[in-house]
Amino acid sequence: TRLENDFGSRVQFVGLSSNSLITHPQDGPAQLAEQAQRHGWAFPYLLDDQQVLAKSLQAACTPEIYLFSHDSKGSSPTLQYRGQLDSSRPGNDQPLDGSDLRAALNAVLIGTSVSQNQVASVGCNVKWNPGQEPEWFG
């Protein structure tokens, strides 16, 4: 929410849940809406129940951060950043501050290159629909 407050007038944030509703019905629309309300998220929080977007992005875990940009001519979005929110992990005493994403956002907004030193996200794996696991998974 801090990132949304700091960048929301210049950036569109979107949340996406791609977990299987077959194996994880607790990740359904009502629960997502409750989660968004509990955390004060004002951005759209979408359900990818067919896992189409997750597969096209080659998502592996949750949370996984993607930052896209586009030029003023309306070109197709360009992936600028894929990685962790920050270095915080349960029990490591690192602050949950969004520093990695914040640095990438600042770079895109001022028109400089985003660092290629992008640390992969760590989290629970995407819960794929049975029999639909992508080839990179497992």
Please provide the spans of the model-predicted regions.
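Short, internal strand/loop/helix patches
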Residues: 32-75, 79-80
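Non-globular targeting/processing and membrane-anchoring segments
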Residues: 5-10, 14, 82-138
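Flexible, glycine-rich phosphate/dinucleotide-binding loops
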Residues: 22, 74, 88
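Active-site donor-binding loop signature of nucleotide-sugar glycosyltransferases
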Residues: 18, 70, 85-87
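Structural microenvironment flanking redox-active thiols in thiol-disulfide oxidoreductases
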Residues: 1-38, 52-54
